[in-house]
Each structure stands twice: as C-alpha cells, then as structure tokens.
C-alpha cells in the first residue's frame, strides 16, 4: 500500500477528481496549501501597486492505493495536472510514500482491504 501526495494547481483539482473517479479511485483527501518551488513566488499588481507574493496557492491531494493501482493513478494525476503539452514550472509534484498499516476506523478492516 502506498500514499500518493500530489501537490497540484487548484484549477486542476476537478479534472483530476473526475479522471480518478472514472478509474474507480474515489477515496481521497484534499486540502489547500501554499508554497513555492523553483519559481519562488510571483509578481502581482493590486490597486496599481506591484508586489511580490512569496507563496503560491496549491491543492494537496492524498490518495492511499494498493500497489495494483499505483502506476495508473500516478499516470492520471501527472497527465491531467500538466499545463501545456510539456508541462510548466509550478504544475506541482507527486510524492509516493510507503504505508505500513491501514486501519478503517468505522469498520474492522485492516491492511490493503481497508484502503
């Protein structure tokens, strides 16, 4: 069992959720985040004054998947989250972490079947 942590553009969230649902990946956690990578923020203008924003808005999507779904899920997130044909700086990152144990709180399932 693996935990996929995808940091993506907020505008891509609905497309990612729809594409994952079509593949029967429907259990996920989403939360808002702010951060920066190589681009180190961006310049914005407010009421005629230019200022530097250090943190950019992102969305983090967490999905626990069984090993059989890992590559398919990664491929969908990567392809749907990309802006432009080749992608751009700021499109996000996908991290894959091992999960040692899964316990379903509302039931009695443990391990891969609890995912």
Over which residues does each language-model region extend?
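Positively charged, small/polar-rich N-terminal and surface patches that mediate targeting and assembly
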Residues: 1-115
